[in-house]
């Protein structure tokens, strides 16, 4: 075992609607997404607020960790993801322990939240070369997980364009069939999330928030990877 991380809760969840939405997003992340990665003993990111590392491994990784550069610029943030990638590259297990629980404060304003998401997404895209290097000999599910998250903005944009073009070029009957299938998939997803503790407000509001704000933030992060402005607060 090279490193491990646990579940993280939200201390200020009751503050407002945004913090409650983030709280439910955290529940989905630490009850569904992280356990799936942990099942293959290859957690893709040991969260900064709550992680442990094998000390004997760190001694050999510090030089690479402290001198990391991207596009000729020294990297000063995104440290939890890069350190996890370096551990994965050693071939050691990186475990997820759901029974170990910590709590953190999350952004309480939309401005702070979007700045946080911009920083996280820049880190995610910048780290892709190290992420794939760390998981190349591991279970294929991990590569699919990373690819799905990396391509999500393009896939969502392409889906919207295809739906619109189908209605104009092929006929509204085919578009209606596609929308029916999409609604059915959304219903199945909603049932799954509700079974895992998500609220109705999360299901109704997080989708528009993701499409309207977080997808553009992810695209902007991809276009501005070399921007050294990383501070969240």
Task: Label each region the model flagged.
Residues 21, 50, 75-76, 113, ...:
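Residue-level recognition of hydrophobic positions within alpha-helical transmembrane segments
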Residues 148-229:
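Membrane-embedded multi-pass helical conduit in multi-pass membrane proteins
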Residues 110, 132-143, 166-171:
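Short juxtamembrane and helix-loop transition motifs at transmembrane-helix boundaries
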Residues 231-233:
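Cytosolic juxtamembrane C-terminal amphipathic helix followed by a basic/polar low-complexity tail immediately after
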Residues 1-135:
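Non-transmembrane catalytic domains and loops of membrane-associated enzymes and transporters
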Residues 3, 136-151:
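Loop-to-transmembrane boundary segments
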Residues 54, 138-139, 199:
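Alpha-helix initiation/capping motif
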């Amino acid at each position: 075992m090279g490193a491990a991380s646990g579940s993280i809760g939200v201390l200020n969840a009751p503050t407002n609607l945004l913090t409650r939405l983030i709280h439910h997003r955290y529940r989905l992340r630490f009850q569904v997404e992280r356990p799936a990665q942990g099942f293959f003993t290859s957690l893709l990111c040991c969260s900064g607020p709550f992680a442990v590392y094998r000390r004997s491994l760190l001694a050999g990784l510090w030089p690479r960790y402290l001198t990391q550069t991207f596009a000729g610029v020294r990297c000063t943030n995104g440290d939890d993801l890069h350190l996890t990638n370096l551990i994965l590259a050693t071939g050691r297990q990186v475990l997820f322990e759901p029974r170990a629980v910590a709590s953190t404060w999350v952004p309480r304003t939309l401005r702070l939240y979007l700045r946080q998401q911009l920083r996280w997404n820049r880190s995610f895209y910048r780290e892709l070369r190290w992420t794939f290097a760390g998981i190349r000999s591991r279970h294929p599910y991990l590569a699919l997980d990373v690819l799905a998250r990396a391509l999500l903005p393009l896939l969502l944009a392409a889906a919207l364009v295809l739906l619109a073009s189908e209605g104009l070029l092929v006929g509204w009957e085919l578009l209606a069939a596609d929308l029916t299938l999409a609604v059915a998939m959304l219903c199945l997803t909603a049932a799954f999330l509700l079974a895992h503790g998500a609220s109705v407000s999360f299901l109704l509001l997080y989708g528009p928030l993701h499409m309207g704000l977080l997808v553009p933030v992810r695209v902007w992060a991809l276009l501005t990877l070399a921007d050294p402005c990383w501070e969240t607060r």
